[in-house]
């Protein structure tokens, strides 16, 4: 009888199974890692442990992976399925030498020497019983629950107390064939493999648990002893004519107001609550790109998460996802408005640090906050902040606030040793709880102050909210970014470290816009966002079911065949499935008559649904512009369409944070896809097939309101070439209100003054504003914008501008 089949061993496994709940990272190793089911597989573990292998066995049974108890058969010879780097630690004395474990590596390498076709995958597996990073002063707790190399007695205690928080993490497989071919098969290579494995497990533990937590008061005193803080305190005392002790006391109060007080115990409790909450709210949370972030952590990067801000749920969602993806929840920069009882203390113990809306005029507060942020980076804590500064009320990304990004970049300039990397994160929901409140605020109602009653009110309304989406965008490593933007930045700083570089502000602004662009690059297309985009482009927000299905299938085909970026995700299924999901979530309305089903958006929900449309409108705005050219312009050639797109793209880019690498290639690919879909023909010029006209008109409707805004602006510019920027913004907004009243435009962003401000800044940058040297360009773009509008809308704009000009 084998050891694992003995009654004693089975009894131990049965007891452990009752005590242990295991979370697997990643959830699907075959999909997220480079595992090949057709190649033999061997697990590499740090320490030989009966309980660890038993926990791994439960996971492998669940995932359909080879059992750790099942030996590997290599051409009739048996090899171990699990290779450990070191032996178990005895209760007393030292663990045995590593010769036995090195022999396991040597046997596997020798098998590759004998069998040239053999290619075993070595898969590192890390096991964690709880994820407490430990504190600088918790030596007693560490003695009882020492996690790195526990004895069997300590392991029993860990299983009893932390068994419900067991994590099994698989890492990328390594080819043993590659190692044998490149480095040989002798004992020296086995030793190297074991050494590499030890380093891997050490780094992996730090990714999973994070750095040791400092004592909060000791941290405060250490921060106040830094040279920069001493200088700031002295300046505060001199400027306010107070004692240094009083200034120091003020600095300590600021630190107490700002600093997080991370508690692993609270995080474990919150994890259980949030698991219940997400299961109650959502049918699932879709995640894309987590593996690249795990790798950045593993490689020693200081990670700064910069998500978009849709809802108060964002704070919880990203931390929860990172926890379950085997990473430490970040320290989150939260607005001081969220520091209300009892949520504030709970957020603080969950990792939140609080930030005032404005630092202006308060040099001591600025110095304290900067020093605290530097300390987070220096100690290796990941950080999260929202660059928009507040939640988007329209579903579009807001213009970035650059304060936190500037502070992060300044930390790099002051010499943070580890590479600091910004990770843009797209957060999306099939239902945002605050949408109704947002539209009340947009219509003039005063914003409610956050309180515990709002939280209770939100929880009371819990229901089926569909799915959530977390997509990690393309990371931006700040050292590389600085090298790209200012190649000589190190030399300049070395010459005068105290002087603010003249290039810093434009470099920060460019970085902030790049972050926002990469958030949008990682957008998630869902059933709700896509159906709302289609229906809101129709005349009555309603379509026949068959027509809606056909249109959704077209959009899905465009998004998958010509992907916006490699970071974008597109919902699985066809148009029929997307409609069914929308109906289930009560976002769509179904009416039936003898001629068939009609799918619509209820009038009471129409404005709210613009929020979801706006989440992804940037993904289909270029296809929509192309469709406008094809349906509104006679004998449109490929070159003419490309020229039209190039005219409007700078404004679209500024408004929607778009970042298409090669615009001309992208337009050509979209045109080729429309040809492949059978909607158009090409013979020097494009012609629309009769069967494709309705689909293209509907696609063109997505950019309709945007083109109306551009037509307003360029008609005003053409009539008054030297118009001032403030006057253009005011007149554009006034004309938009008139146009909306006459043609029933209800989308909130159509009347957004800030949007016209963004466009006017871009126009000035392009040289179109207050400069008649570009009058020919303005006239051309005005003509193109007018040609893409319905005749009634065009006439309203032309007549209104003429009346304005004559007044």
From Swiss-Prot:
Pfam families: Acyltransferase, GPAT_C. One of its GO terms (biological process) is fatty acid metabolic process. Its EC number is 2.3.1.15. SUPFAM superfamilies: Glycerol-3-phosphate (1)-acyltransferase (SSF69593). This is Glycerol-3-phosphate acyltransferase. GO terms for molecular function: glycerol-3-phosphate O-acyltransferase activity. Keywords: Acyltransferase, Cell inner membrane, Cell membrane, Lipid biosynthesis, Lipid metabolism, Membrane, Phospholipid biosynthesis, Phospholipid metabolism, Transferase. GO terms for cellular component: plasma membrane. The keyword Ligase does not apply. A motif (HXXXXD motif) lies at residues 308-313. It comes from the Bacteria. It is found in: Cell inner membrane. Pathway: Phospholipid metabolism; CDP-diacylglycerol biosynthesis; CDP-diacylglycerol from sn-glycerol 3-phosphate: step 1/3. It is a peripheral membrane protein. Disulfide bonds: none annotated. The keyword Acyltransferase applies. It catalyses: sn-glycerol 3-phosphate + an acyl-CoA = a 1-acyl-sn-glycero-3-phosphate + CoA. Belongs to the GPAT/DAPAT family. SMART domains: PlsC. Its main location: membrane. The HXXXXD motif is essential for acyltransferase activity and may constitute the binding site for the phosphate moiety of the glycerol-3-phosphate.
């Amino acid at each position: 009888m084998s050891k694992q089949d003995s009654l004693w061993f089975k009894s131990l496994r049965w007891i452990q199974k009752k005590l242990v709940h295991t979370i697997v990272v990643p959830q699907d190793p075959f999909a997220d890692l480079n595992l090949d089911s057709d190649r033999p597989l061997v697990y590499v573990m740090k320490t030989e442990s009966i309980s660890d292998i038993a926990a791994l066995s439960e996971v492998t049974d669940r995932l359909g992976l080879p059992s750790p108890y099942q030996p590997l058969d290599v051409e009739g010879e048996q090899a171990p399925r699990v290779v450990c780097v070191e032996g178990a630690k005895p209760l007393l004395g030292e663990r045995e030498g590593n010769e036995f474990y090195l022999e396991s590596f040597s046997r596997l390498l020798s098998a590759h020497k004998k069998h040239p076709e053999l290619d075993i995958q070595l898969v590192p597996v890390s096991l964690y019983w709880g994820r407490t990073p430990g504190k600088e002063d918790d030596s007693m707790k560490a003695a009882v629950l020492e996690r790195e190399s526990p004895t069997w007695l300590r392991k029993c205690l860990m299983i009893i107390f932390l068994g419900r928080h067991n994590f099994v993490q698989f890492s990328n497989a390594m080819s043993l064939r590659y190692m044998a071919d490149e480095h040989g098969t002798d004992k020296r290579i086995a030793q190297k493999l074991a050494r590499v494995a030890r380093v891997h497990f050490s780094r992996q533990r730090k990714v999973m648990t994070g750095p040791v937590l400092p004592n909060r008061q000791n941290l405060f005193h250490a921060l106040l002893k830094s040279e920069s803080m001493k200088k700031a305190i002295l300046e505060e005392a001199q400027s306010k004519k107070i004692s240094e002790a009083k200034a120091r006391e003020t600095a300590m109060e600021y630190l107490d107001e700002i600093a997080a007080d991370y508690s692993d115990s609270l995080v474990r409790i919150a994890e259980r609550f949030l698991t219940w909450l997400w299961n109650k709210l959502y049918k699932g949370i879709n995640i894309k790109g987590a593996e690249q972030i795990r790798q950045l952590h593993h490689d020693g990067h200081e990670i700064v998460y910069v998500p978009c801000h849709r809802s108060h749920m964002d704070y919880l969602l990203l931390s929860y996802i990172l926890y379950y993806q085997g990473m430490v929840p970040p320290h989150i920069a939260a607005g001081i408005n969220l520091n209300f009882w009892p949520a504030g203390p709970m957020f603080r113990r969950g990792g939140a640090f609080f930030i005032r809306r404005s630092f202006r005029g308060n040099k001591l507060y600025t110095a304290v906050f900067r020093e605290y942020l530097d300390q987070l980076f220096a100690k290796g804590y990941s950080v999260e902040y929202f660059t928009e500064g507040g939640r988007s009320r329209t579903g579009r990304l807001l213009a970035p606030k650059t304060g936190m990004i500037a502070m992060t970049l300044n930390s790099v300039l002051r010499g943070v040793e580890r590479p600091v990397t910004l990770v843009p994160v797209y957060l999306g929901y099939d239902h945002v709880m605050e949408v109704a409140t947002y539209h009340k605020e947009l219509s003039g109602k005063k914003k409610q102050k956050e309180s515990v009653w709002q939280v209770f009110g939100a929880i009371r309304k819990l229901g089926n909210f569909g799915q959530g989406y977390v997509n990690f965008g393309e990371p931006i490593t700040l050292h590389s970014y600085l090298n790209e933007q200012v190649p000589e930045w190190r030399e300049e700083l070395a010459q005068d470290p105290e002087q603010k570089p003249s290039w810093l502000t434009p470099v920060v602004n460019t970085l902030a816009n790049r972050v926002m662009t990469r958030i949008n690059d990682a957008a998630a297309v869902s059933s709700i966002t896509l159906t709302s985009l289609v229906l809101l482009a129709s005349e009555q927000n309603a379509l026949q079911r068959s027509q809606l299905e056909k249109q959704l299938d077209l959009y899905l085909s465009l998004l998958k065949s010509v992907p916006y970026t490699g970071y974008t995700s597109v919902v699985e299924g066809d148009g029929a499935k997307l409609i069914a999901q929308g109906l289930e979530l009560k976002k769509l309305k179904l009416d039936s008559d003898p001629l068939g089903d009609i799918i619509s958006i209820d009038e009471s929900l129409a404005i709210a649904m613009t929020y979801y449309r706006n989440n992804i409108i940037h993904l289909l705005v270029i296809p929509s512009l192309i469709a406008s050219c094809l349906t509104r312009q006679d004998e449109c050639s490929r070159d003419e369409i490309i020229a039209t797109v190039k005219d409007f793209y700078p404004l679209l880019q500024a408004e929607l944070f778009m970042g298409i690498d090669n615009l001309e290639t992208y337009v050509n690919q979209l045109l080729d896809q429309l040809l492949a879909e059978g909607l158009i023909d090409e013979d020097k010029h494009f012609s629309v097939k009769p069967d494709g006209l309705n689909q293209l008109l509907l696609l063109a409707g997505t950019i309709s309101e945007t083109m109306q805004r551009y037509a307003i602006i360029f008609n005003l510019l053409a009539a008054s070439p030297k118009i001032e920027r403030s006057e253009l913004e005011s007149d554009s907004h006034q004309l938009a209100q008139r146009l909306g009243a006459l043609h029933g435009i209800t989308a909130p962003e159509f009347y957004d003054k800030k949007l016209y401000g963004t466009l006017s800044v871009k126009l000035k940058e392009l040289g179109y504003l207050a400069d008649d040297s570009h009058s020919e360009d303005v006239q051309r773009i005005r003509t193109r914008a007018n040609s893409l509008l319905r005749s009634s809308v065009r006439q309203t704009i032309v007549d209104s501008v003429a009346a304005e000009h004559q007044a």
